[in-house]
A protein has these predicted regions:
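Structural motif
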Residues: 73-74, 102, 116
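Short, P/G- and charge-enriched loop/turn segments at secondary-structure junctions
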Residues: 4, 55-56, 98, 143-145
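Hydrophobic, well-ordered secondary-structure elements that form the walls
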Residues: 17, 37, 70, 81, ...
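Residue-level preference for beta-strand/loop junctions
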Residues: 11, 31, 62, 104-106, ...
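Active-site lining segments that contact anionic ligands and/or coordinate catalytic metals
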Residues: 65, 76-78, 105-109, 119, ...
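Gram-negative outer-membrane beta-barrel transporters
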Residues: 2-93
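Outer-membrane beta-barrel proteins
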Residues: 8, 99-101
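C-terminal beta-signal and adjacent terminal beta-strands/loops
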Residues: 85-92, 113-162
Length: 162
């Protein structure tokens, strides 16, 4: 049985920069597009040493992460492509009481929607388009620990308002 516990006092500092802009100034049909960008930086003064003397910070926190989204939307069609990325981070302790880290990870997602009428919409969503895998290491990057393939997930739905 494992659980996460508070690490005691620490200071977490960070900054988030966000930009969102509909591109209505462009000629048709590009005037129905838009862009959204986001960057986050976090830093903590918490530094713990593992049983083997390797430093780890806050669990599940990446120092850097960003998201980029392009979208299109008109009366009938909506489309969105998004890329999300995060730095490596301290994940958990292994059974040997060593630190497990996840390497940097990025994922591309795409979604489409078509409005047949105002009450009937078909949607297609594809997550992890590039079939990116999560990679883990133990304390130093050269010490491979695991590989988790998330596969590409495709969802299709039809929504009808009665």
């Amino acid at each position: 049985l494992q659980t996460k516990v508070n690490a005691g006092d620490t200071t977490l500092k960070g900054v988030e920069l966000a930009f969102q802009q509909p591109l209505t100034m462009l000629p048709a049909p590009f005037d129905k597009t838009g862009v959204q960008l986001n960057y986050t930086f976090t830093d903590s003064d918490l530094l713990q040493l593992t049983k083997y003397g390797y430093p780890v910070g806050l669990q599940d926190f990446s120092e850097n992460s960003y998201n980029a989204v392009l979208w299109y939307e008109d009366d009938k069609l909506e489309a969105r492509i998004a890329y999300n990325w995060r730095d490596d981070y301290y994940d958990t302790l292994t059974q040997a009481n060593a630190a497990q880290f996840q390497k940097p990870y990025g994922q591309l997602d795409v979604s489409l929607g078509y409005h047949f009428t105002k009450d009937i919409v078909a949607r297609l969503s594809v997550k992890n388009v590039q079939n990116e895998a999560e990679r883990y290491y133990q304390e130093i990057e050269e010490r491979f620990l695991g590989y988790k393939l998330n596969d590409t997930m495709v969802n299709f739905s039809i929504q009808a308002v009665l």
